Amino acid sequence: MKYITIALAKGRLAKKALEILEQIGITCDEMKDPTSRKLIFTNEELKLRFFLAKANDVPTYVEYGAADIGVVGKDTILEEGRKMYEVLDLNLGKCRMCIAGPASAKELLHHGELIRVATKYPNIAKDYFYNKKHQTVEIIKLNGSIELAPIVGLSEVIVDIVETGSTLKENGLEVLEEICPLSARVVVNQVSMKMEHERITKMINDLREVLTEAQ
């Protein structure tokens, strides 16, 4: 039996995903050791391998088959646009992708004038403005705190993840439009789904059962 490799997005998400996996009998004690310098963790009994990766890299590992399964946020899946199957919503890390800005910017979203949009997610922003709103925009890619952009006049609006909206409010900004809901998803490599169909499908069904019971 070959190993099935699971890539987890580093941070809180990996910790929560491992807790759910434990509920279906999938454990990896090696990963719980905070002093470990290992990059790959193994459960020999279940023939499973785990590794932690930067969120944006998880879809790449899965598309190319370096990982059979990945756990990553929907924001990363949309932004990276990789070829893979999205099979399950884990209902973890729920938040929203939104257009935000000062209240005065709301009207700018309803006429055809060119506006500037600052974001960490240029592909999501481009898709939403061009394909859904049919509005021409200039997209400015930033890596730091996006809320700063409209305050200092770099952009009229921003596209960003909103959890509670309190950071926006503190900076005199608000949600102007919601693009889509976000949460952690399970993704599967297309070839792995065929080659290891039985094992992967069982894992997905067991996870689905646990999630249904928790609701």
From Swiss-Prot:
It comes from the Bacteria. GO terms for biological process: L-histidine biosynthetic process. InterPro entries: ATP_PRibTrfase_cat (IPR013820), ATP_PRibTrfase_CS (IPR018198), ATP_PRibTrfase_HisG (IPR001348), ATP_PRibTrfase_HisG_short (IPR024893). Its main location: cytoplasm. One of its GO terms (molecular function) is ATP binding. SUPFAM superfamilies: Periplasmic binding protein-like II (SSF53850). Pathway: Amino-acid biosynthesis; L-histidine biosynthesis; L-histidine from 5-phospho-alpha-D-ribose 1-diphosphate: step 1/9. It catalyses: 1-(5-phospho-beta-D-ribosyl)-ATP + diphosphate = 5-phospho-alpha-D-ribose 1-diphosphate + ATP. One of its GO terms (cellular component) is cytoplasm. CDD domains: PBP2_HisGs. Keywords: Amino-acid biosynthesis, ATP-binding, Cytoplasm, Glycosyltransferase, Histidine biosynthesis, Nucleotide-binding, Transferase. It is an enzyme of class 2 (transferase). Its EC number is 2.4.2.17. It is found in: Cytoplasm. The keyword Cytoplasm applies. NCBIfam families: hisG. Catalyzes the condensation of ATP and 5-phosphoribose 1-diphosphate to form N'-(5'-phosphoribosyl)-ATP (PR-ATP). Has a crucial role in the pathway because the rate of histidine biosynthesis seems to be controlled primarily by regulation of HisG enzymatic activity. Lacks the C-terminal regulatory region which is replaced by HisZ. Belongs to the ATP phosphoribosyltransferase family. Short subfamily. Heteromultimer composed of HisG and HisZ subunits. This is ATP phosphoribosyltransferase. It comes from Lachnoclostridium phytofermentans (strain ATCC 700394 / DSM 18823 / ISDg). The lineage of its organism: Bacteria, Bacillati, Bacillota, Clostridia, Lachnospirales.
